[in-house]
Design a protein with these regions (language model features):
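Amphipathic, non-transmembrane alpha-helical scaffold segments
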Residues: 11, 61, 65, 69, ...
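Short amphipathic alpha-helical elements of helix-turn-helix/winged-helix folds
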Residues: 21-25, 175
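Short, hydrophobic secondary-structure boundary micro-motifs
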Residues: 35, 112-116, 161-162, 188, ...
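Helix-turn-helix
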Residues: 2, 6, 17, 25-63, ...
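Short secondary-structure transition hinges
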Residues: 103-145, 167
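All-alpha amphipathic helical-bundle segments outside canonical DNA-binding/catalytic cores
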Residues: 92, 137-139, 155-173
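C-terminal peripheral helix-coil segments that are non-catalytic and often amphipathic
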Residues: 1-2, 100-103, 144, 148-156, ...
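Hydrophobic alpha-helical connector segments
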Residues: 63, 78-108, 165-172, 198
Length: 215
């Protein structure tokens, strides 16, 4: 039994090495140009080993996204508990989530860069719902968090509920994430070398609050 445990642990550790290595490569170079052979070389493994752990590149890409957003959700939940967000108003809770996204821009640009390219890559592949199930199960956790916020808003009236829950979630969370990804990757055109992206991001946050939160 101990032998089997050690074997399984070794497989898990090797999979994690592949995922972490692939994540860095995908974030730095985009997903499409990075081959499984390149991943294998950077892991100091044979490409056959990579394919044993992940049958296709698409499977690896989804595994990377799932692991990284699972880790981020864990960090989000830790901050949620530490700040006692459950006791906040809906507007304060919305600000909490937006601020955590802004923290991604400041502290984890690799995840933003990977995520921007992930959406493009998945859209270009023939991806089934079953293949996306592990990833979607993590994203559903974020959706459920926002559902709790929206229910709170129905009681305390600090966030508008004349706009549907889904509309606010997509307009705020997804649009904010998309904007942060563009700022992080530097693809927003600017002729001004001294342009203050963080100031612009805070202005974007203020715009959301002006529209969605009650005065």
């Amino acid at each position: 039994m101990r032998y089997l445990d050690n074997v399984n642990q070794s497989i898990t550790e090797r999979r994690d090495i592949v995922i972490e290595t692939a994540f860095k490569l995908f974030a730095e170079n985009r997903i499409e140009p990075v081959t499984m052979t390149v991943v294998a070389d950077n892991c100091n493994m044979g490409v056959a080993s990579i394919y044993r752990y992940f049958g296709t590149k698409k499977e690896l890409v989804i595994a990377v996204a799932t692991k990284k957003w699972r880790e981020y959700y864990g960090e989000l939940q830790r901050h949620y508990n530490e700040l006692n967000v459950e006791k906040m108003t809906a507007a304060q809770e919305l600000e909490f989530y937006i601020d955590r996204y802004i923290d991604l821009y400041k502290e984890n640009s690799d995840l933003l860069n990977f995520n921007a390219n992930f959406s493009i890559y998945i859209a270009s592949e023939d991806t089934t719902k079953d293949e996306m199930k592990p990833y979607n199960s993590i994203i559903d956790k974020f959706v459920n968090k926002f559902h709790i916020l929206y229910k709170k808003a129905q009681d305390d009236k600090t966030v508008r509920t004349d706009i549907s829950e889904k509309s606010i979630f997509y307009n705020v969370m997804y649009a904010m994430l998309s904007a942060l990804s563009k700022y992080s990757s530097g693809i927003i055109h600017s002729a001004d070398q001294d342009r203050n992206y963080e100031k612009e991001i805070c202005q974007l946050k203020d715009m959301y609050f002006e529209y969605y939160c009650r005065k």
